[in-house]
Amino acid sequence: MKTKLKIGDSVKILSGKDKGRIGKIASINRKKNKVIVESCNMVKKVIKARTPQEKGKIIDKEAAIDISNVMIFVKGTSSRLGIRFENNEKIRYLKKNGQRI
């Protein structure tokens, strides 16, 4: 599925345990249709000790969210994204109000 979202875009979570939260996209996996949003969908990950002298750790890490569960968020408005060409330049805009991004 082709997505119009880019790394660094501000998005709103539409479903799941973090529903309603807003964050920036840290990475996009286009093959699996997943995004990682900064400080959202946090999970605990156990890191084993590599040597007997080291201790294991538990860290918080962002887990991936399906692209269909996020929506672009700009200046208090969440909307679908559209693309149009103006003067041979690709412009991304909000479909709800036509605002350019």
From Swiss-Prot:
One of its GO terms (cellular component) is ribonucleoprotein complex. Belongs to the universal ribosomal protein uL24 family. It comes from the Bacteria. It comes from Borreliella afzelii (strain PKo) (Borrelia afzelii). GO terms for molecular function: rRNA binding; structural constituent of ribosome. Keywords: Ribonucleoprotein, Ribosomal protein, RNA-binding, rRNA-binding. The lineage of its organism: Bacteria, Pseudomonadati, Spirochaetota, Spirochaetia, Spirochaetales. Part of the 50S ribosomal subunit. It holds the Pfam family KOW. One of its GO terms (biological process) is translation. InterPro entries: KOW, Rib_uL2_dom2, Ribosomal_uL24, Ribosomal_uL24_CS, Ribosomal_uL24_KOW, Translation_prot_SH3-like_sf. The gene is rplX. This is Large ribosomal subunit protein uL24. One of two assembly initiator proteins, it binds directly to the 5'-end of the 23S rRNA, where it nucleates assembly of the 50S subunit. One of the proteins that surrounds the polypeptide exit tunnel on the outside of the subunit.
